[in-house]
Structures are given as C-alpha cells and as structure tokens.
Amino acid sequence: MRRYAILGATGNTGQALLNVLLQSPDNQIHAYCRSASKLNRLRPEISQHRQVKVWEGSLEDVSLLSECIRGTRAVFMVVAIPDNMPHCTIAQDCTNAVLNTLKKLQAEGCQSLPKLIVLSSASLEDSLCADVPPLIHRVLNIAAGNLYSDLAKAEKILRAEKHWVSTTFVKPGGLVHDVQRGHTLSTKTAKTPVSFLDVAAGMVEIADMDDKTYDMMNVSVNAIGDGTAFPWKGVYYVLTGLLFHFFPWTYKYFGDSPMPKPRKDL
C-alpha cells in the first residue's frame, strides 16, 4: 500500500490528483487543505472514503503538516492560485513549510523522507518552450510574472537542499479542464494544452518511480495525441494578468484571492 500527501487538495491539480490516485484501491491519500468544508463541497464522498484522510490547517502548522507527510511515499506540492497576484509568495511559503516539516521528521528519527513533486510551469524554462513564438512567450511571462517569480524563488530554495531532499519540478504547458487522454513525460519540450488529469497522472508516475531518474530535473507532462480542449479560460487570465502587472492596485478589485502585503524578507 502506497501513501501520498497532497498539499492543496482543493485546487484544480489537487482535485485531479485525487481522481487519479483513487483509480487504484491500494493507494492511501493524505489530503491537506485550508478548508475541509470546501473539500467536502467539492467531493462530498471524501469525508467517508476509506482511502482518504483529510488534514485541515495552514502551512504554518508544522506539527499538523508533519503528521500529514509522515510515512508517505511522495508529497505533491500543488498549492497555487490561478491569477497574477502581486507580491505572491505562496510557492515560497509552501516550500519553506515543507522543508521545516522534513527537518522536524528527521530530528524525530524518520529514516526515509518522501519525494517532493512540485507543480511549476514550462514558462520558466526556455528549452521547454522552444516551439512557442517569442512574442507570445514574452506576453505570457508578463501576464503571470508574479507567479513565475514566486515559483523560481521556491525552486532555488529547493535546489539548495538537493543534498538531502529529492525533488522533481513538473513544468507543463497550458492547463485545461478535460478528460484524461494519456500522457508522456518529457525533459525536452512542453506542449499546450494538457489536461489537469493528465498532468496529475504524470506526477503520480514520477512519484511511483523507484529510482531517481527525475531527481532535481525539470519534467513536462504532455498529452498523447490531439483533441485536448483549448484553454479558453487561460485567455481571461492572460488579460487580467497583464492588467495586474501594469496596474497592481486593480488586483484588489478583480483578483481571485485577497491581496497580500509586500514582504521584505523574500
């Protein structure tokens, strides 16, 4: 029986991971979220599901987070927001919380630490986006620049800990809600679009590998064949992302989440 922890279980990728992992009756899932009531609204069956245990809390609660992560094979770090929030530090906050938790587990005598499977973006790697026209790539980087900056800083933190933490950075192209069509893993190119379900399946495949094939590597998940729906919602987020980039104060009125205050320590 394999145990996995999902950090960000109420998000799009977190929900997709639940779907993929529950395809096997042998998987045990530790779902961590800020709001158990939201998770129950999204998945009413979860509260009584024998394969799922839910932890409700903040990332700052290292004791609770350690209980969620303890004994798992892999931790899926998919805490995210969909829009270009100014001063975003959610990826860095999650990374620091997980590292503090792993240090706690080590201090308590834990002999085997889980892999970290981190959801990132292909836009951080020019090599994965070689097929994207330069102008479009530039626009996308501006429209999600705050998120990408946060992801890049979080990745730098994790790479500095490579001597004791095993991490894989999953960097897909544009994500969309669609059926699971099958996927391939690639370290050379990222194709858009790809469904959340296919990305989740790719993340699980990486987690289940017994070797360190993708340790500290950038890996994209690509859909097999054609037919994946066009990410029309992504167009909306590009437009609002440009708005938030040039006029950050507008996020207070049109953003998806409460706007954080700038932090001087990051």
UniProtKB/Swiss-Prot annotation:
Keywords: Monooxygenase, Oxidoreductase. Its EC number is 1.-.-.-. InterPro entries: NAD(P)-bd_dom, NAD(P)-bd_dom_sf. It is an enzyme of class 1 (oxidoreductase). Pathway: Mycotoxin biosynthesis; aflatoxin biosynthesis. The keyword Disulfide bond does not apply. This is Oxidoreductase aflX. It comes from Aspergillus parasiticus (strain ATCC 56775 / NRRL 5862 / SRRC 143 / SU-1). The lineage of its organism: Eukaryota, Fungi, Dikarya, Ascomycota, Pezizomycotina.
